[in-house]
Amino acid sequence: IGYQTVIYKDITLQLGEVYNLNVEMSESSELLNEVIVTAAKTKFTAEKTGATTNISSAQMTQLPTVNRSISDIARLSPYANGMSFAGGDGRSTNFTIDGANFNNNFGLSSNLPGGGNPISMDAIEEVQVVVAPFDVRQTNFIGGGINAITKSGTNTFRGTAYTYYRNQDMRGNRINGEDLGARSDESKTTYGFTLGGPIIKNKLFFFVNYEKEKTPGEVIKYRAREDGEDAKGMVSRTLKSDMEKVYNHLKDKYGYDAGSYTNFPADEENTKLLARIDWNITDRHRLSLRYNNTKNTAWNAPNGNSSDTGYRLNNTYRVGTQSMAFANSMYSMDNKVQSWAADLNSRFTDKIS
């Protein structure tokens, strides 16, 4: 003897919201072979311990974001301004992934590790922004904290493939009727995929995300001047003929190719990889393993401290109206971050876990 099926629709709960649903069921004479109960538990605690903003993956999909970054999503909190909260220093903000700290330990800027966004937005299930919480479990920061929960596999195989493209034609050049002039060339291409599913149904699951960003650019926009040409704008007083002489001297005497002095390609690349395994060991023990790898490559012009012009070139490094450099004098800065995290949840009794 069982009960007839009762279906309630159009009930939507926000993270942390408590809702009581009173259900009246009628008896049925049918014999039930089995009862299957499925539920999706909230990733964060339902008890608020301060000003909290929770953002689901569905909301993140609908939100406009230019940079596809955590700071874009955190703007849903009225306290947020980039990685700064309530007017505080962004370096004091704490960022966690699946409960593990993921901060910029170097401490010179509020940028996250990896030279950009260390985790793809398509790998995030939920984001929580907290400001001055009084929960003693949330520590190591002053002011604001961002907690991100990554996606995990389910009993159904699911995958996505995506690409995003942006260039200067997608950016306006007029504000309040004022023409800002010609837009400089720029482009950014992002592509990636996600895949998740069961290894053993109801027991072992996997989730993988890969994403790559490419941003073509030029670090040096100055050019050497022709004979008789004025050195103004983006034209250096260094003569093109002098650059040619130096190039030929290095090539003939030392066999060294100094590179171009008219073209300075400096493409920036960012690669992200995330892999996660979830294991339901028993009804009382669950284990999660996550691996995250981020690599960012950015090119820089020669350092301004090595200039022989008698003063430091803060804005243009060693290239500007007074001097020029060759392409092979540039250097790349590779920012690599690897992170491992393991989370074991065990419930020994109804009161001890």
Model-identified regions with their sequence ranges:
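Transmembrane beta-barrel strands of outer-membrane/channel proteins
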Residues: 39, 161-167, 208-212, 289-293
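Extracytoplasmic loops and strand-loop junctions of Gram-negative outer membrane beta-barrel proteins
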Residues: 55-56, 108-111, 128-130, 175-179, ...
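Periplasmic N-terminal accessory/gating domains of Gram-negative outer-membrane beta-barrel systems
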Residues: 4-24, 31-152, 177-179, 192-194, ...
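Outer-membrane beta-barrel domain signature, strongest for Gram-negative TonB-dependent receptors
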Residues: 213-353
